Structure formats: C-alpha cells, structure tokens
Amino acid sequence: MRLLRGVYEGPGSHGILRVAASMKGVHAVLRALPGEGYFPALYGARERTGEAAPVSLSPLSERAEDSWGPGNLARDLSSVVRRHPETEAVILARSEAALLSDEEIPEVSFPEEGGRAPKLVTCNWENPGVGEVEAADLALEDLVRAHARGRRERSPSPTANLFGPPVFGPGAAAEYAEAERLLAMVGVGVNTRVPLGASVGDLGRLSGAWVNVLLYREVGESATLYLQDEFGMQRVTTPMVGAAGTGAALRTIGELCHLDPKKVQQAVWAELARTAKLPWYARLYRPETFRERRVAIFGDFTYPLGLGYALSREVGLEVAACGTYLGHLERDFLFHAHTFTDEAFVEDDPEEVAARIEASDPDLVVGTHLEEGVADSLGVPFLPLCPPVVRSTFVQRPLMGYTGSSVLADALDGGLGLMEVEPEPVEAAGMPWTGEAREELAQTPPFLRGRARRLAEDRARELGSTEVTREIFLGSRR
C-alpha cells in the first residue's frame, strides 16, 4: 500500500451527486456509511448560494430486516418525495461501502403529484471501478433517457442545447454564459443548458433543438450520443478554448443550423477585433518570450486538449507533454493530443504525472492544483487552468470562448513574463564581465537582472575596476 499526496477525482457517487445538485427538481439519495455524508457541507462551501444541497443520506448500518427506522433504503427513498414535494426525479447514489455490501435495490413507487409521479433512477451500472467524472457522465445519460420524450418538432428558429460542466466545475456558470453569448451573436438561441440549471421538464424538451453543443465532453458525451442515436440530433464537440477553437466551433454550428456563412464569419472577425486578446498577444509580444519555450499540460479532457491546440498553434509554444487522468477516455484523448505533441499520456497517479512532467523539461506547467508542487520544484511558472483546482474565486471568469481567450492571454502574460530573457550584461561604455560574474548574474531571477547588472557596474566604477568580477557583483548586492 502506498500513500498518495492527492487524487484527481473522487468516487463515482460524488459524480452522481454533482449532477443531481446541478439540476432543478432532482433529489439524490446517497446510500453510504454515516461518516460519508459530507457532500452538503462541501456544496455550501463551494457554491455559496445559500440553498441546501438536494442530497439526503441513507445510512448503511446493521438493523433488523423489518425495521423502518433510519437506514431502511425503501423508507428513505419514499420519504424524499414526502419531505421535498417539488422533487420530480430521485436518483440513487451508492458509496463504495454500499456497493461492496451487495444489497438489492428495493422497488419503490412514488405517489402522484399533479397527475405525475417522480421517477426513480437507480444507476445500475455503478461499481467501485467507475470514477467521479465517468459516473457523472453516465448519471446524466440515465436522467436524459428517463425524461427525454419522443421526437419533438424543431423550434422555428435555430436553437442549441448546451452540455457543459456540473457544479464544482471551475467557472462553470461563466462558461455557459460565454457560450450563450457567442451563440446569440451568430443568431442561435439556447434551448436548454444541461446539467447546470436544467429542470426535469427541460430534459423533455431536448429533442426540440437543432444541434447539441458539447462544451464539456467529460459529462455530456454519453447523453449527446444517446440523443444522436435516438433522435438523429447532430453534435459539435470542438473545444471552445482559444480563438481558433472557438471560431471553428461557431462555424460548425452555423453549418448545422443552416446559417449564412458570411454573417457567421463577420461575427467571428468582430469578436477577434473586439474581445479576443490571445491572437494579438501572441503577435505583439516579444518573440523571445515564446521561441523554443516548452509547456507541459495535464488535466481532465476538454481543457488540456483545448489549451494544447491554443498554445501550440496560436501562441507558438512547444507542447512537451500533454496528459489526462481519465482512463475511460484514453483512446480519444491520445488521438487528439498526438496532433500537437509527441508525448501524450494517460495517468492517474500524481507521482507518475510529476515524473512525466519533470522528464519533459518544461518552461511552463499548466495543470491541476496537484501539479503546482512539480512546477515549484522545477522553478518554472505554473498556471492552474485544468480541473480539479482548489482555488475558488468569488468572480467567475470563463476560459472558453473569446472572453476566455483574453483570460488565457492574461494568465500567460503573468506566467511567461517571469521567463523573459534579459539581454547579455554588456554596458554601453563597453565594461566587460568575467565568466564567474556572468554565472552569478544568470542565477538572479530574470525580473531582477537589469537592476543587478546596473548596481554591479556602478560598484565597479566606484572601485576603479575596468571589469565586473564575481567579488564586485556579490559586493554590490549587500
């Protein structure tokens, strides 16, 4: 047994709870040990909405078989509808302890409210090997299967379903808002946003949209594939990260919605001129900042791939390594990542990830909060742009879309600015430096080298020396 310094994702039950907490009218029952009911506290601390998480705990403990006290699963499922009459769907999540107990799921019938009884979604695919992200994806598919009705007539004007991240996703609400703004810009409305903020009734209206836009493939993959097979709904999977990726996604949406390509292109150009800072940043910044710079990227799926495309093709950085911790998406990830890097990998052990990053010898690390220590040990800048991240800001900013490209440009400016190469320490008057003095100057942080050089040369003039030696350089710093 080995002690890990962290994990990238939680158990499958946590993914189910995240999806349930993202939606309206859905209540989750967590079958787990009494000490595992931490989700409501985590939800309150992260979301800050003032509302309780729609999660109830059914404690797993020894009791008489005919007991109807707390912990009886059938009773706990039935009581949810009684205590929360607004519930339209109940989803059952089981912890690893509950799964290993191998108890049977009871048959429960809910009373009708307003002529309609809530549905019970049991997630029969659960097993200890399914992680948080995959479980969230499968849980959303189960909810869509249970509530998506027959093929509805398409809306008169073009509309799209947005499938994005659930709660706890960094900047999740901001990502939806940016995508909705961009779709409105090209003349496409939003039919519904799934799962964040969607109601059970919204799931029944999914088939009325013209296209499904997959912002976050990790959670919407299975649901959109079901809608594609069942109702023939086409989907757009291009990551909206960076200016080029956003433009490609908008043009694809325009084609599927039969929009005028010239108007779509005009809208894209307008955003490039008005909002997107990344292309301008890449062209107007000093070339030395990007030349032969290597970046290592690690995260979930959408963000590492989107950032890999943007940093390699728009900024000009060399992607030394790109990896994910999602083993169930390994084939798709490697297929896409190999288009911009030779070193693509799948790994969920933080120590192995650290070793991979160190071996790639990067100048910049982009990843989850677990990669910050690796960047510190290498002495290179770190950008926490891929989930999971522990920093939760009050003001959410998107990383997708043209607004997100400006956020990315600002982050790169802060990170790469510390790596700017100072010119060789040569004074206008021609004062030379010894080799040892140059080596000492090279060990000075880049943003302090200019001042250190001037102080050393002033000190040499005061001492009447014709060159800057190691002793003069060290003496000038006192």
Predicted regions span which residues?
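An N-terminal assembly and electron-transfer interface module characteristic of large anaerobic redox
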Residues: 1-430
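Non-catalytic accessory segments flanking P-loop/AAA+ NTPase cores
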Residues: 424-478
